[in-house]
Every structure is written in C-alpha cells, then in structure tokens.
C-alpha cells in the first residue's frame, strides 16, 4: 500500500479501508482475503458504514461526501457549503439517527488544482438524517481531524490535531453540539470507542503509536506501531474484538479483550 486510512467494518465484520494515494478502497474479509472494492474511489479518506449498509466516504478528489451502496452505486451527499467547496472532508461518524458528522480540515493534495482552502474555518459539519441540512457545529478548532461518538448518540469526540487536544461535546436533538469540555490534551488522526467507553486514539505528531484512554481521560493502554504514522482505527472481525490499525503503508490487527462500541467502527 501507499498510505492506508479510513477503516470501517460492515455488519459481518469485514474490514474496508482506503489505500488513498492509489485511489482505491480495499476489503479484508473475515476469512483473510484481500480484494479491491472500488477503484477509482475519488481518493476516498475517512469512511463509516451506516445502518443500511451504505459506505459513507469522504471523497477527497472533489471535496465531497459520498454514499456508496452495497452494489457500488454512488450517491453524492455533499458537494459544497454555501456555494463554496469544502476544504477537504477528512473523517466521518454516522450517528444512530442517521445524521453524519464530518471533519473538514485543509491538507493540500497533489491531485487538486487549487492551493488555498475555500472556507474561512476548518470546521466540523453535521448533515441531517434526511440529507437536507448541512451546517457547521464546531468552528473554533485549529484543524479538526479524528471524530467518533457514543452508540447512544449522546456524546461526540473531536480531535484537534494541530491544537493537540481532543474535545467532548453533548449532542442535541437537532444535531448541534453543546457543553464543550476538554477530554485529553492530545490530538489524533483517527479514533474509535470500545464497549466500555474507552477512546482508542492514533498518532498526533508527537507519537506515532496507538493510545487508549478511559472515559475520564486517564491513559490505560498503549500499542506500539512499527510505522512512521498510525492514521486510523476501528473494531471488526466476527466477534468485533479485532482492532484494525491503518498505519502508513500497512494494515495491522490486534485481538482485544473488549468489543467496539459502534457497529461499523
């Protein structure tokens, strides 16, 4: 692989992830078979399955948000905000109600013609379950990147990788956020939650490994990753106790004692 990212698992525990510079989405089945699911993929980045089995993907080539059906039919959910291109949809979390939270930082890509970000802020957006409303819910972070939430749909975590902090928010019924509190003084490229509410976090520029924090923000675990960068994580496998780590040019897995909290992440 050239650079792996965006891990998510379907309802059967099969892993899907991106090999972004090679413009492809890969599948690693529960019986250990590797195949190409979609190529080209619009240089997809962060991904997560929704409850209907659609693969929600940050489509990086044209700064869009896609929904890829099981038959690989593509629906474009978001193309712009207020008539302007998004900066670069990076990672997503699909809430239990079907709403989608998306981080939109700016990382200059070699496949873009433009060199400046289109929007003033590097924000977190929310797309309503009916796909009719898109609005920013976080505007005050330096570079939001990793994102995940609790399976009850009440709490959202957002990592500010440039600010090197991860924040916790309460989710309101309309999808907006309140009660911003500091979870831990560490940013993260990607992250996920286990069934105990522990947060599993990837590289932040200071460390390239995977670090685990309990719900109070206390570090309780550390996984050495023999790569230059750990980009993202998700739980999968038949028992949902396998932690998959996309890291630089490789894909890693480690058997955990706990399951993932979210069905697809």
Residue ranges, per PLM feature:
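Sequence-structural signature of mature extracellular/luminal beta-sheet repeat domains
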Residues: 1-265
